């Protein structure tokens, strides 16, 4: 990692370049997380979405035909199924996906601090945080839902709290602390943060557009949907790397947290692909 990563906030180009480098350098352990955590989630989501679509189709057909005493029970049953499976999708996003996100983020931190990349340790620590993920996830979900009803506060907080999962996984925050910690890192930099998140989202959407071709290889819609969901998580893993790097950079610059490794432990190659030990511009000027 370039020395100034821990002392200066990087710009978008530096962050994005580092994100591609870290993602490529750790593709094997990231794929392991995808296979162990996100592949089962993809299959689960495919089942949930399939059932929700069926229920919604019935709901729509009855609504268009007109609700009467003869179909009233079916109408409310279909409505219940739509709401139930929508709730399941929300729970998966709040409680299961963060486990994989934290595992990848921990490997990013291991990489930038020049520690040995341990997939097993990262995944084990992520699973051990499940109680905190659930508790903080409930608080986050309820508050985001309530503020989203007013739209503008919901948009503001969704960006201000973007680091709440990383605060749980990388900084050991609990309860409301992850949201406060994230907001402190975004304070005064909301638009800059929003812009970078938008850039990551655009890259992920471009990848996902290419991944839509996977549907043509599977005649079974449910299997095709599961494969597509999994490939979308590949894009999401890149976004996670980008967000984790931004979090670590902001945290080190804001709080002076000793994220940087000892000089004797640092290998020659940096995160951005430069070689450590070469004279810096300031050192060359001194000479």
Show which residues each predicted segment covers.
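Juxtamembrane transition segments at transmembrane-helix termini in multipass membrane proteins
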Residues: 1-7, 14, 18, 55-70, ...
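Generic N-terminal leader segments that precede the first folded domain
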Residues: 5-67
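Interfacial aromatic "cap" segments that immediately flank transmembrane helices
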Residues: 13-40, 119-146, 157-208
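Membrane-water interface of alpha-helical transmembrane segments
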Residues: 28, 72, 76-86, 222-225
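Hydrophobic alpha-helical transmembrane segments in multi-pass membrane proteins
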Residues: 34-53, 84-101, 133-158, 194-240
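Alpha-helical transmembrane segments of integral membrane proteins, especially early/N-terminal helices
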Residues: 43-64, 115-128, 156-157, 195-197
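Long, highly hydrophobic alpha-helical transmembrane signal-anchor segments
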Residues: 56-81, 118-138, 210
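Hydrophobic alpha-helical segments and helix pairs
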Residues: 94-127
């Amino acid at each position: 990692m370039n020395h100034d990563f821990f002392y200066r906030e990087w710009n978008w180009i530096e962050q994005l370049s580092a994100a591609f480098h870290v993602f490529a350098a750790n593709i094997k352990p990231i794929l392991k997380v995808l296979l162990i955590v996100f592949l089962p989630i993809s299959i689960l989501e495919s089942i949930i979405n399939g059932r929700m679509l069926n229920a919604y189709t019935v709901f729509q057909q009855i609504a268009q035909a007109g609700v009467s005493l003869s179909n009233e029970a079916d109408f409310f049953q279909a409505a219940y199924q739509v709401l139930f499976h929508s709730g399941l999708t929300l729970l998966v996003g709040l409680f299961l996906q963060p486990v994989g996100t934290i595992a990848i983020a921990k490997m990013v931190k291991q990489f930038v601090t020049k520690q040995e990349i341990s997939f097993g340790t990262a995944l084990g620590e992520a699973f051990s945080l499940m109680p905190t993920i659930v508790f903080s996830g409930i608080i986050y979900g309820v508050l985001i839902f309530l503020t989203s009803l007013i739209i503008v506060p919901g948009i503001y907080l969704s960006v201000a709290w973007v680091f709440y999962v990383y605060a749980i996984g990388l900084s050991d925050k609990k309860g409301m602390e992850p949201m406060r910690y994230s907001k402190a890192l975004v304070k005064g930099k909301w638009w800059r943060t929003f812009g970078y998140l938008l850039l990551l989202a655009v890259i992920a959407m471009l990848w996902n557009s290419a991944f839509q071709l996977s549907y043509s290889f599977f005649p079974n819609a449910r299997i095709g949907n599961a494969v597509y969901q999994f490939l979308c998580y590949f894009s999401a893993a890149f976004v996670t790397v980008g967000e984790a790097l931004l979090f670590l950079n902001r945290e080190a610059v804001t709080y002076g947290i000793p994220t940087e490794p000892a000089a004797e432990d640092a290998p020659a190659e940096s995160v951005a692909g430069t070689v450590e030990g070469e004279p810096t511009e300031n050192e060359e000027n001194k000479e």
